[in-house]
């Protein structure tokens, strides 16, 4: 039985899922079922091609996508437990796995630290001796692009085009040296260091090629130079037939600003002449009218590959364009339309999304939604692991795992307060710098007594001894001879530092209660995972191993499902999502397309507009049933009302003029709102709330 009939795949999907004669590139248009193809292919490799699950790796760009993919694969396998043997992870999680296994080859401790964004910002701030946040971020951006482009500090210095570049390259050199002293890596190092290791050590590279015999890469258009090089190093070798499948869409490449290069798709055909190209063009998400608008916009970009999305969902509702007097009116109109449309259809709030180019556009929309009492969530908000109270606890775990981690030492020793002030840390830091040792080691180094009086040294040594005791216990967790477990170690740590008391002392009761509940949720998760997972079967998930992984996580597993609320999101954060009804707002020149940063290294005017056009395409293709695109004739900027021009992208949608502009009845004003409500009450409504009935006009 073919995959077409057995699993309901269309012909190109089936071909992609079963192709096994070498490297394969699947060009998967928006909504074309790419995740289904990847999961079916992995099942095919295991069930029909004799691959052991432990020799297959699938790489994604988010932890959520990786978890969902693994769950779907388990449902396809005759033995679902085999899914646990797969490597389904982000690029960065795979990098951690490689570095943890090969740390000694790179001069790293097994328990190296992973610096979070705040740590990296503070380090650059210290090295640059500036408090200019914009300058610090520019330097960070330059260093990230250098690392992702596999450019070392000396090469960056040699190619510096101006004095600003020279300054950034010098800071880059000091930054790399400081991380090495901390026995720490940053986010970009998690891929850069494995690439450098595989290039320089053939034996290690061969070992990992034997471990990972088939590689699948999702969202290939979002890979940077470093990630592409890692893929090549894993799949190529003397006498080795490259076995991998890359899945991507050149029309959805929207991350050039963080080093991704769309050229990686093209480069595949050069580096792998036998590459099989398969196109997925049938869209299972959107109506024909929505796809026509998307195809019309993206046709203005030069094409790496010809591709035309189509759908069997029928024409659907016309795409509407709304020209609003200002952003207040835009926000109010959208809120009222959502309220009316939801009432008419008995729809859920979660069926609606409001998408915009930048976070700043969301503020006025939030006010309008609150006025209409419409619940909403904001994508791309603060990660659970970015909360201050969680970072406080993580700093202890990082220090237990790696006593050379100076940023973790500084945060932990000062939170909660234990009599260690800034002056004490300055003296300790100077002493540690003199001897080229960590702050932790300096606490016990001979000669420190001459620098710090006993009253200042005593709390430091008490703290350091406490960390040493916890480290010894955490190392023993899981051993048969040890009575300790992760829960006991964590409970004793929390009791000793008295963090709950600190919260209620430092914050008002309601805020302290919320923060403490977050800490309890986090420690509960650690207790479960730190003993080898729910069933204790994962030896890699010891308490100290988890300390390394926490830096990569964006959410707790098993937290509450998405609430019934309107989704507000930037266009970048909306990628991969879909909604029955979408409002795409602020489609004006200077916003979408964005005016851009003239100092951004990757930007030329043409490249920037092309990427912005792809962003518009991503926004359009999030919509399943209805799409409203709005722009304002005036918009508030820095408390001033400025004139705005309609975006070129609206013109490029090539909408029929009669369809594109809402009728007077469709624009809800205070005068006609009551009449509209009466009409809705008199109108027969659908008998169910699943929005599967024939679309009606939005009133």
Name what the model sees in each region.
Residues 1-2, 657-699:
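Acidic, low-complexity intrinsically disordered tails
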Residues 26, 30-38, 42, 103, ...:
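Helicase P-loop NTPase motor core
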Residues 216-223, 247-248, 584:
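Hydrophobic residues in beta-strands of the RecA-like P-loop NTPase core, especially within AAA+ ATPase
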């Amino acid at each position: 039985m073919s995959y077409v009939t057995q699993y309901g795949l269309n012909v190109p999907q089936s071909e992609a899922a079963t192709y096994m004669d070498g490297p394969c590139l699947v060009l998967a248009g928006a909504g074309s079922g790419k995740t289904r193809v990847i999961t079916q292919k992995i099942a095919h490799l295991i069930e029909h091609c004799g691959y052991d699950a432990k020799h297959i790796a699938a790489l994604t760009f988010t932890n959520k996508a990786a978890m969902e993919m693994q769950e779907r694969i388990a449902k396809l396998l005759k033995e679902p437990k085999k899914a646990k043997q797969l490597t389904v992870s982000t690029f960065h999680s795979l990098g951690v796995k490689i570095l943890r296994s090969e740390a000694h080859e790179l001069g790293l401790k097994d328990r190296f630290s992973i610096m979070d964004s705040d740590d990296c910002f503070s380090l650059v701030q210290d090295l640059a001796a500036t408090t200019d946040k914009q300058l610090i971020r520019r330097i960070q951006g330059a260093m990230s692009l250098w690392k992702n482009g596999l450019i070392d500090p000396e090469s960056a210095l040699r190619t510096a085009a101006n004095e600003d570049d020279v300054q950034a390259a010098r800071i880059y050199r000091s930054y790399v040296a400081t991380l090495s002293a901390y026995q720490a890596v940053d986010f970009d190092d998690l891929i850069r260091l494995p690439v450098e290791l595989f290039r320089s050590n053939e034996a290690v590279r061969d070992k990992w090629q034997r471990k990972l015999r088939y590689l699948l890469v999702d969202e290939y258009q979002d890979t940077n130079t470093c990630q592409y090089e890692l893929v090549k190093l894993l799949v190529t070798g003397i006498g080795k037939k490259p076995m991998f499948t890359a899945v991507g869409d050149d029309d959805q490449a929207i991350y050039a600003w963080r080093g991704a290069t769309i050229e990686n798709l093209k480069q595949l055909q050069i580096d792998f002449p036998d590459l099989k190209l398969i196109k997925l063009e049938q869209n299972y998400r959107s109506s024909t009218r929505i796809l026509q608008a998307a195809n019309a916009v993206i046709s203005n970009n030069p094409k790496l590959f010809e591709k035309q999305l189509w759908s069997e969902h029928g024409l659907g509702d016309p795409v509407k364009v709304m020209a609003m007097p200002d952003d207040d009116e835009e926000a109010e109109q959208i809120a009222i339309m959502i309220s009316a449309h939801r009432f008419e259809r008995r729809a859920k709030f979660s069926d609606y999304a409001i998408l915009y180019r930048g976070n700043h556009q969301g503020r006025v929309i939030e006010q309008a939604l609150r006025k209409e009492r419409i619940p909403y969530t904001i994508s791309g908000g603060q990660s659970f692991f970015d909360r201050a109270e969680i970072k406080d606890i993580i700093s202890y775990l990082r220090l237990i795992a790696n006593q050379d981690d100076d940023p973790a030492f500084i945060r932990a020793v000062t939170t909660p307060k234990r009599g260690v002030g800034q002056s004490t840390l300055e003296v300790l830091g100077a002493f540690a710098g003199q001897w080229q040792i960590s702050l932790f080691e300096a606490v016990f180094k001979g000669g420190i007594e001459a620098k710090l009086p006993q009253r200042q040294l005593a709390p430091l040594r008490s703290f350091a001894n406490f960390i040493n005791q916890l480290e010894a216990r955490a190392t023993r967790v899981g051993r048969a001879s040890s009575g300790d477990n992760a829960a006991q170690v964590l409970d004793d740590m929390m009791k000793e530092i008295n963090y709950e008391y600190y919260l209620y002392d430092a914050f008002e009761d309601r805020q302290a209660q919320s923060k403490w509940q977050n800490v309890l949720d986090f420690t509960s998760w650690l207790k479960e995972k730190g003993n080898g997972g729910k069933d204790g079967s994962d030896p890699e998930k010891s308490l100290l191993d988890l300390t390394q992984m926490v830096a990569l996580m964006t959410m707790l597993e098993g937290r509450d499902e998405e609430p019934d609320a309107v989704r507000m999101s930037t266009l970048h954060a909306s990628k991969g999502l879909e909604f029955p009804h979408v409002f795409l707002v602020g489609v004006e020149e200077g916003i979408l397309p964005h005016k851009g940063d003239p100092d951004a290294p990757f930007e030329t005017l043409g490249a920037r507009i092309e990427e912005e056009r792809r962003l518009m395409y991503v926004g359009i293709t999030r919509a399943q049933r209805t799409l409203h695109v709005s722009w304002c004739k005036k918009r508030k900027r820095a408390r001033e009302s400025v004139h705005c021009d309609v975006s070129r992208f609206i013109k490029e949608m090539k909408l029929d003029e009669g369809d594109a502009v809402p009728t007077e009845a469709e624009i809800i004003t205070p005068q006609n709102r009551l009449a509209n409500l009466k009409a809705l009450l008199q109108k027969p409504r659908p008998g169910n709330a699943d929005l599967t009935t024939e679309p009606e006009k939005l009133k």
